[in-house]
A protein has these predicted regions:
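C-terminal "exit" segments of structured domains
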Residues: 179-204
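Flexible, low-complexity junctional segments that flank or bridge functional domains
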Residues: 1-80, 84-92, 96-102, 180-182, ...
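Extended C-terminal subregions enriched in glycine
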Residues: 139-173
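C-terminal soluble interaction/assembly domains
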Residues: 169-183
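Terminal peptide-recognition signature
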Residues: 23, 74, 140, 159, ...
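Gly/Ser/Thr-rich loop/hinge elements
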Residues: 81-139, 179-180
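Low-complexity, Gly/Ser/Thr/Pro-rich intrinsically disordered linker/tail segments
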Residues: 203-246
Length: 246
C-alpha cells in the first residue's frame, strides 16, 4: 500500500488537493530527541516536520492557516501502532479534550478499567487554562486498512465514538498492549496481550477491528483487491463534505 500511495500522491507525508489535506502517519511515534530540543530551544514544529508526530502537528497548523483547506485526512492505512501517549495527544488536538481516557477490560476478571491522562495541548510544558485555546476548525476523517494495527486500530474506534468519519476497510485489530514473541526458528511476531482488551465508549471489545463508515476497497473480476480509492483526494473530499453536511 505504501507503493500505491507513493505512485498516486508522490513522496512525502503531507499532500493537499482542493479543499482537502492528507497526512500519512505510519506509526504513533514520539521522537524523543527532537522533542527534548523543542522544549529546550523553542521554535516551530515546521523545524521538525520530518518527525512523525511533530510533522503531523506542523501539517495540521498549515491546513488550519490555509483558507482553501476545510478537510483533513489522517492516513493510518499503513500504521502498525506505537505509543498510546501520541494517540491521546492527537485525539486531544482534534477534539479539544484536555483529558485523555483509555478504556480497558480485564480478560481475567472482566472488570472495566479507565486510565486517564492530562494533555499539554499547546506544548508549553504546563497544564493550564491556555491549553483550551488550541483549536482546529477542520472536518477530520481517518483512513484505515487491514494494516492498521494496535494504536492504528484504537484510534478509529475513539474517533468514531466522538462522531468523526472513518474511511477505508476494516482495521487490523489488536490491543494497545501487545506481546513480542519468537518461534523456535527465530521468527519474530506480535500478538495482543492476554491480560487486557481495549473497549469503546459502549464497553464493546474492539480488538477484532473497526468497520469503516465508508468502505473504499474495490474487488476486481479476478478477486484482487483494488485500494486506489484510498488515495483519491477528490473522492475523499466528496465523502467528507457529504458526511459533515448531514
Amino acid at each position: 500500500m505504501m507503493d500505491l500511495r507513493r505512485e498516486m500522491l508522490g513522496d512525502g507525508h503531507y499532500f493537499t488537493k482542493g479543499d482537502t489535506a492528507f497526512y500519512s502517519m505510519n506509526g504513533f511515534v514520539a521522537d524523543k530527541e527532537p522533542w527534548k530540543e523543542y522544549y529546550a530551544k523553542g521554535g516551530s514544529f515546521d523545524d521538525y516536520d520530518e518527525t512523525v508526530f511533530m510533522g503531523l502537528i506542523s501539517s495540521m497548523n498549515k491546513a488550519k492557516n490555509d483558507p482553501e483547506i476545510h478537510n483533513f485526512v489522517i492516513d493510518l492505512s499503513t500504521n502498525g501502532g506505537g505509543s498510546a501517549d501520541v494517540l491521546l495527544g492527537l485525539i486531544s488536538l482534534i477534539t479539544g479534550e484536555r483529558e485523555g481516557l483509555l478504556k480497558y477490560q480485564s480478560v481475567l476478571q472482566g472488570q472495566s478499567i479507565d486510565q486517564k491522562f492530562l494533555i499539554d495541548r499547546n506544548f508549553d510544558g504546563k497544564f493550564d487554562e491556555a491549553d483550551a485555546d488550541v483549536h482546529y476548525d477542520l472536518n477530520f476523517a481517518v483512513l484505515v486498512s487491514h494494516e492498521s494495527y494496535s494504536c492504528g486500530n484504537l484510534f478509529p474506534s475513539m474517533f468514531r465514538d466522538r462522531g468523526y468519519l472513518v474511511l477505508g476497510e476494516r482495521s487490523g485489530g489488536g490491543a494497545c498492549t501487545i506481546l513480542g514473541l519468537n518461534t523456535a526458528d527465530g521468527f519474530y511476531y506480535h500478538i495482543s496481550s492476554y491480560q487486557m482488551r481495549l473497549t469503546n465508549d459502549a464497553g464493546e471489545v474492539i480488538d477484532a477491528g473497526i468497520t469503516p463508515d465508508v468502505e473504499l476497497v474495490k474487488t476486481g473480476a479476478d478477486g484482487k483487491k483494488d485500494y486506489s480509492d484510498f488515495y483519491d483526494l477528490t473522492l475523499l473530499s466528496n465523502l467528507i463534505n457529504d458526511f459533515y453536511a448531514k
